[in-house]
Amino acid sequence: MQEVTIYSDGACKGNPGRGGWGAVLVAGASEKEMFGGEPNTTNNRMEMTAVIEALRALKRPCVVRVYTDSQYVQKGISEWLPGWKARGWKTADKKPVKNADLWQELDTLAQPHQISWHWVRGHNGHPGNERADALANRGVESIGR
């Protein structure tokens, strides 16, 4: 299976507010940059959308390393998701899972791949994360004011 590294980030001007997402996909010597935005969203939704759009771009099952500065994404997919699914998309205290639509989409898109999820400290000079951050900000700017 092909190995792919994904660096993802989300940004929001206001929370909720104008948001953007960015992702860098690296497979060997090939790289792809992606970004987009939404007019009324949250930082967590943009963090998730970055990974969703990156996984959507993969055309076949891959071994994937995802690097995100969002503990919400990293812990959500690695730790919390199985419990949410078992409880019918409810949290441990029986409340509806926030962003369940995106969690369900992310769960579906992750299935064909062997994914390892890695948290990196944001704005700490990590080159892949810095590129994803710049793309996410381009996504915000693409929405206008």
UniProtKB/Swiss-Prot annotation:
GO terms for cellular component: cytoplasm. It holds the Pfam family RNase_H. Its EC number is 3.1.26.4. Keywords: Cytoplasm, Endonuclease, Hydrolase, Magnesium, Metal-binding, Nuclease. InterPro entries: RNase_H (IPR050092), RNaseH-like_sf (IPR012337), RNaseH_domain (IPR002156), RNaseH_sf (IPR036397), RNaseHI (IPR022892). Mg(2+) 1 binds at residues 9, 47, 69. Its cofactor is Mg(2+). Endonuclease that specifically degrades the RNA of RNA-DNA hybrids. This is Ribonuclease H. It comes from Cupriavidus necator (strain ATCC 17699 / DSM 428 / KCTC 22496 / NCIMB 10442 / H16 / Stanier 337).
